[in-house]
Amino acid sequence: MANTTSAKKATRKIARRTIVNKSRRTQMRGAVRTVEEAIAKGDRDAAVKAMTRCEPELMQAAQRNIIHRNAASRKVSRLTQKIAKLAK
């Protein structure tokens, strides 16, 4: 339990930030899921369209320290490779 007023305030700030970060993480995961579903169906056009929405979501999450920037780049790279395989 926080004793000082600054520690109590920090606890409140963390709680607010956690809610925002969870929301952004959920939004990011949903964007990734739509790309993966389109890839699973074999629908290249839908996958490309979903990827144009997904990539900025991942990069913004990395900028806001919700996920690591290397993790975001790795996810984008792997999804892009899967989409490229659909073209063949």
From Swiss-Prot:
- Alphabetized SUPFAM superfamilies for the sequence: Ribosomal protein S20
**Which biological process annotations from GO are given for this protein?**
translation
- Keyword annotations: Ribonucleoprotein, Ribosomal protein, RNA-binding, rRNA-binding
Molecular function via GO: small ribosomal subunit rRNA binding; structural constituent of ribosome
What pairs make up the disulfide bonds? none
InterPro entries for this protein: Ribosomal_bS20, Ribosomal_bS20_sf
NCBIfam families documented for this protein: S20 (TIGR00029)
PANTHER family (alphabetical): 30S RIBOSOMAL PROTEIN S20, SMALL RIBOSOMAL SUBUNIT PROTEIN BS20C
Question: So what family is this one in?
Answer: Belongs to the bacterial ribosomal protein bS20 family.
What this protein is reported to do is described as:
Binds directly to 16S ribosomal RNA.
Name of this chain's protein: Small ribosomal subunit protein bS20
